């Protein structure tokens, strides 16, 4: 039995659904939200790589590197906001983000 494109796509769909569920169930903790968004991006990347492999086109794999770059920048900015929020309010609750308005 070999692993087919359907296996990769179903795994990607399960990871994506898990991240969406994580976002909807926990909307208070900023760290969990960032992890769920990263899991969502990785599920999309898995689908891109699977399609790229099975279609023989390298464009999907190149696009994954761009997504990883944007995801790294998003994580850095999100963690910087988290540090500022924790220093000012001693909490990582998303509801406290309006306190950072200047």
UniProtKB/Swiss-Prot annotation:
The chain crosses the membrane at residues 5-25, 31-51, 62-82. Pfam families: Oxidored_q2 (PF00420). Signal peptide: none annotated. It comes from the Bacteria. It catalyses: a quinone + NADH + 5 H(+)(in) = a quinol + NAD(+) + 4 H(+)(out). It is a multi-pass membrane protein. It is found in: Cell inner membrane. GO terms for molecular function: NADH:ubiquinone reductase (non-electrogenic) activity; quinone binding. GO terms for biological process: ATP synthesis coupled electron transport. NDH-1 shuttles electrons from NADH, via FMN and iron-sulfur (Fe-S) centers, to quinones in the respiratory chain. The immediate electron acceptor for the enzyme in this species is believed to be ubiquinone. Couples the redox reaction to proton translocation (for every two electrons transferred, four hydrogen ions are translocated across the cytoplasmic membrane), and thus conserves the redox energy in a proton gradient. NDH-1 is composed of 14 different subunits. Subunits NuoA, H, J, K, L, M, N constitute the membrane sector of the complex. Belongs to the complex I subunit 4L family. This is NADH-quinone oxidoreductase subunit K.
